[in-house]
């Protein structure tokens, strides 16, 4: 009888292991951007419509559209990983997964690995102060299925294929991505809970005047309660002391579920410990990473649309580069953690909007759009390309996503720029180089040996 019971127990354990393995290794299938039930929102929007918004400088329409994009990206799917429901953007392939794929419609078996933001590395080549030896702000760069399949089909991460687009004494360029393409840069804060189950998170305060201001220098924090014991959506008062009182901590504490977040699994924790943080905390299965920011570009217009989102303690009154005007346009359909983020947009480089080529900075106004967690720490040494429009623009807080990404080329020699108009047919700037359709992620991840 004991042998029978022992045998049954072994069978049960074996079945459990097999079942767990199947669940653990279930594929994550990238999903298309969903239909979002928000009035007057359409994706992809017709380029003619967006260009009309630009002609009218209709920032209300532009911001409303960016909120619709955010709603779609953060919509829950019917897929789970490590017990957590995946949001739309979380199902998409990371850039290295795309680089390693030879077939369209590729799935993945894990969450995309987190890495130090490429722009931190690029910036550090010019200014070592951009980063230090420990990283708590980490990113992924992911492409939606349209963009991923296009990159794979056209071998856009293969050096020899990219070089085939070169034009002698001219400007080469890769093919334009499809108009439904979306590229995202989800950016996470990695923190370990203290003895009270609280994760301390730096929050942006938008200093005046502009300066190089890394998240490690902000000295303003909120706390995320991993047990979600706080009153939902309470008014937060961030702490500014390194040794706050119990009451100050209480007033600065929100629930973890007011951040988009996920739990590290064993593989994710091991990856971080091996690759990212050399002198700091050891991560383990079950630790949390919190989404604090995300750059998003869509190919709805020639120069792509650019919007960036960041978490803020008071989403109804976000700091610059967002605004109360932008917050007031947030649709009522956007709820939960996703509603706790602010938005900044750059659908043009300057106002009035300029043509792809033949435009000018003369008599224009700057459009400032950056992400505090990404560009906030950039100082003068980071920007290679001189700003002839506003020479005083020397900080990350004076940038525009479109202007900077216009300089994405195979050689990458122009580097980064602060906000100004970039003529895409500027032979002096782009001669004998290959434009990468505004995507620095191609330049940063291409295999030049293939």
PLM-predicted stretches and their roles:
Residues 24-403, 408-450:
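Conserved small-residue
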Residues 1-4:
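Positively charged n-region of N-terminal signal peptides that target proteins for export
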Residues 18-21:
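C-terminal motif of bacterial Sec signal peptides marking the signal peptidase cleavage site
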Residues 6-13:
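Sec-dependent N-terminal signal peptides
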């Amino acid at each position: 009888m004991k042998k029978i019971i022992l045998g049954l127990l072994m069978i049960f354990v074996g079945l459990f292991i097999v079942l767990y393995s199947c669940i653990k290794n279930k594929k994550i299938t990238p999903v298309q951007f969903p239909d979002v039930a928000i009035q007057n929102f359409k994706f992809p929007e017709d380029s003619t419509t967006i260009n009309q918004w630009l002609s009218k400088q209709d920032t209300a329409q532009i911001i409303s559209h960016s909120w619709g994009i955010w709603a779609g990206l953060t919509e829950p799917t019917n897929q789970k990983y490590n017990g957590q429901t995946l949001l739309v953007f979380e199902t998409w392939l990371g850039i290295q997964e795309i680089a390693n794929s030879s077939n369209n419609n590729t799935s993945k078996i894990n969450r995309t690995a987190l890495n130090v933001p490429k722009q931190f590395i690029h910036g550090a080549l010019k200014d070592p102060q951009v980063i230090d030896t420990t990283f708590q702000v980490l990113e992924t760069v992911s492409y939606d299925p349209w963009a991923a399949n296009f990159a794979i089909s056209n071998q856009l991460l293969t050096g020899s294929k990219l070089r085939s687009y070169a034009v002698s004494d001219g400007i080469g360029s890769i093919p334009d991505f499809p108009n439904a393409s979306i590229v995202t840069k989800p950016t996470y804060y990695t923190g370990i809970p203290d003895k009270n189950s609280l994760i301390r998170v730096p929050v942006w305060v938008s200093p005046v005047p502009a300066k190089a201001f890394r998240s490690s220098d902000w000295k303003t924090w909120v706390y995320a309660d991993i047990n979600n014991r706080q009153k939902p959506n309470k008014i937060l008062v961030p702490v500014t002391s390194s040794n706050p009182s119990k009451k100050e901590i209480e007033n600065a504490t929100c629930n973890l579920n007011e951040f988009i977040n996920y739990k590290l699994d064993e593989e994710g924790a091991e990856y971080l410990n091996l690759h990212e943080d050399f002198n700091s905390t050891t991560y383990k299965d079950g630790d949390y990473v919190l989404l604090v920011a995300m750059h998003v570009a869509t190919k709805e217009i020639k120069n792509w649309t650019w919007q960036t989102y960041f978490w803020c303690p008071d989403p109804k009154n976000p700091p610059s580069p967002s605004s109360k005007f932008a917050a007031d346009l947030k649709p009522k359909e956007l709820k939960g953690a996703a509603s706790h983020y602010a938005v900044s947009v750059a659908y043009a480089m300057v106002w009035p909007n300029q043509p792809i080529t033949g435009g000018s900075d003369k008599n224009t106004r700057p459009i400032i759009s950056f992400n505090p967690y990404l560009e906030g720490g950039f100082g003068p040494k980071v920007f290679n390309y001189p700003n002839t429009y506003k020479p005083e623009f020397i900080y990350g807080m004076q940038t525009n996503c479109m202007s900077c990404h216009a300089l994405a080329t195979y050689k990458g020699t122009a580097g980064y720029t602060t906000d100004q108009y970039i003529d895409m047919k500027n032979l002096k700037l782009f001669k004998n180089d290959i434009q990468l359709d505004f995507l620095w992620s191609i330049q940063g991840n291409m295999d030049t040996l293939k």
